[in-house]
Amino acid sequence: MSDQPVTPTTDPERRTTDDHGHDLVTPLQAAVLTVSTSRATADDADDPGGDTIQSLFEEAGHRVVARRLVADETGAIQRVLDDLLDDDTVDLVVTTGGTGATADDVSPDAVGERFDRELPGFGELFRQLSYEEIGTRTIATRATGGIARDTPVFVLPGSTNAVTLATQEIILPEAAHLVGLATRHLVE
């Protein structure tokens, strides 16, 4: 047996391949990071976006192993994200909130600085699917995705409709494969 500790993503019990030989990690262990200055300062803040993400992951047979709430400030977002990326039990991170076009919406910028590789197709597909629901207003979202320290990270708007759309239609169908791809070099 190796002296190297086994982390959840490298555990052979959680790694498999699909019919096409694609690496998969399942069940997934996700972290949810809600970005909202108003909610972060409230004593009993509700978190509909985070609750929606957690519910959808659990309904799909996955686990949410961490939930965090942070103000829409670059340094605060990056500190909490860094903690989540350092947590060996976290396979992927989904953030909600702070993706709009106002000066206060800094999630894509703060998280994007942590990306080793961007996943531009995520934002492109999200905006395409959003267009079908909300029309041209989709241009105001800066939803994005990428790989940070071998961990897929998705940056979603705060709207529960947007969270549901992105999680059901894009993230859940692809996350097990993305986690497998992002961590394959750790087990080869």
Predicted regions and their residues:
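Proline/glycine-rich low-complexity loops and linkers
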Residues: T102, V106-E188
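Short coil/turn connectors at secondary-structure junctions
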Residues: P27-L28, D88-V90, A148-T151
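Generic recognition of short, well-ordered alpha-helical segments
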Residues: D44-P48, R79, V106, L165-A166
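Glycine-rich phosphate/diphosphate-binding loop of Rossmann-like nucleotide-binding domains
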Residues: D18-D72, A76
